[in-house]
């Protein structure tokens, strides 16, 4: 079944970031997710508070490297800064490395990757693809790797607690995808393929999970009432 941008998923199978998705990923996400690039800009602006000379920044689930690459371009004039993307899909890292040859991309799951002491760790629409029973362990690992004064930025799609509001947001999301060229069949196919793969939480559930992992200072930034950025120090 087709989900748009020449991405085809076999009937009855779940969504995967492998199997040729990397070649079409950039176009697909920009046409699928409202304010995708604006979210990158917001993360980069926030990074100014944490990236200094000799800093280390990770992006978890770095895909084709656009966000970690943009962050690096913003701070590359600083002394010996390091920006590392962690992505378990080899094809994604191949695309990322071809665009940003000066950066390091590690092909590994976050669970298996070794995190060095770091000033900033970014998760941009990544944690929602991790099974819920594994998230606390990953968040604890992130917390333990941050240096004093460091930060974790979590950018996630969340479920609204009010069913009426949730319905409005879902409806607007579908309209956004239609306006960007996706057919109703492609939208439905993508939605069905994501069942059991992308598992979203409410805002309260995410905050509680983060606090359980050790984060004590949790703040939220709302982006035009569409995206939620959870900002942790």
Q: What are these model-predicted stretches?
A:
Residues 136-148:
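A short glycine-rich, Lys/Arg-flanked "PGG" loop and its adjoining helix->strand segment in the class I
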Residues 122:
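A conserved beta-strand element that flanks and buttresses the S-adenosyl-L-methionine
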Residues 213-233:
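Core SAM-dependent methyltransferase catalytic element
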Residues 1-24:
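N-terminal, positively charged/glycine-rich alpha-helical extensions of SAM-dependent methyltransferases
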Residues 149-157:
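Conserved beta-strand signature within the Rossmann-like core of class I S-adenosyl-L-methionine
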Residues 58, 63-112:
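Class I SAM-dependent methyltransferase SAM/SAH-binding core
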Residues 158-209:
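C-terminal alpha-helical "lid/dimerization" subdomain adjacent to the S-adenosyl-L-methionine
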Residues 37-53:
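Conserved alpha-helix/loop element of class I SAM-dependent methyltransferases that forms part
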């Amino acid at each position: 079944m087709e989900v748009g941008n020449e991405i085809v998923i076999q009937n009855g199978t779940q969504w995967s970031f492998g199997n040729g998705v990397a070649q079409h990923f950039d176009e697909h996400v920009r046409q699928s997710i409202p304010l995708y690039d604006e979210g990158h800009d917001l993360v980069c602006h926030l990074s100014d508070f944490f990236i200094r000379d000799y800093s280390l920044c990770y992006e978890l689930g770095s895909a084709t490297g656009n966000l970690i690459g943009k962050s690096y371009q913003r701070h590359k004039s600083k002394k010996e800064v390091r920006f590392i993307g962690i992505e378990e899909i080899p094809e994604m890292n191949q695309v990322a490395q071809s665009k940003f040859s000066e950066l390091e991309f590690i092909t590994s799951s976050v669970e298996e990757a070794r995190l060095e002491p770091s000033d900033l760790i970014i998760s941009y629409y990544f944690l929602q693809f991790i099974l819920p029973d594994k998230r606390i362990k990953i968040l604890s690992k992130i917390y333990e790797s941050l240096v004093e004064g460091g930060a974790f930025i979590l950018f996630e799609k969340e479920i609204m607690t009010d069913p009426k509001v949730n319905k409005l947001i879902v409806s607007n999301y579908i309209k956004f995808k239609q306006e960007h060229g996706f057919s109703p069949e492609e939208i439905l196919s993508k939605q069905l393929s994501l069942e059991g793969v992308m598992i979203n939480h409410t805002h309260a559930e995410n905050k509680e999970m983060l606090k359980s992992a050790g984060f004590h200072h949790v703040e939220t930034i709302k982006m035009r009432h569409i995206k939620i950025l959870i900002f942790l120090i």
